[in-house]
Amino acid sequence: MKLTCMLVVLLLVLPFGDLIANTGGLCGMPPGVCYPNGCACGQDTPCCHPSGCNRYNYCGPLLE
């Protein structure tokens, strides 16, 4: 039971590891917001620049 609880906690925390470690934030959708800097994004990956959004205020495969 204790092991199961630890595994559940790890599964809940691991997706946010990049969000915590990367100052650029994690891109998620829908509607597509890059946390914590708030730019729009087109894919569910860590894609925003550490300094914020790119010149199009967007992060994604086409506009990086």
Curated annotation (Swiss-Prot):
**Keywords from the named record:** Disulfide bond, Neurotoxin, Secreted, Signal, Toxin
Which portions of this protein are annotated as coiled-coil regions? none
Signal peptide range: 1-21
Q: Which modifications occur after translation, per UniProt?
A: Contains 4 disulfide bonds.
Q: Which family does it belong to?
A: Belongs to the conotoxin O1 superfamily.
Q: What is known of its domains?
A: The cysteine framework is XII (C-C-C-C-CC-C-C).
Q: What protein does this entry describe? A: Conotoxin Cal12.4
Q: Whose protein is this, by species?
A: Californiconus californicus
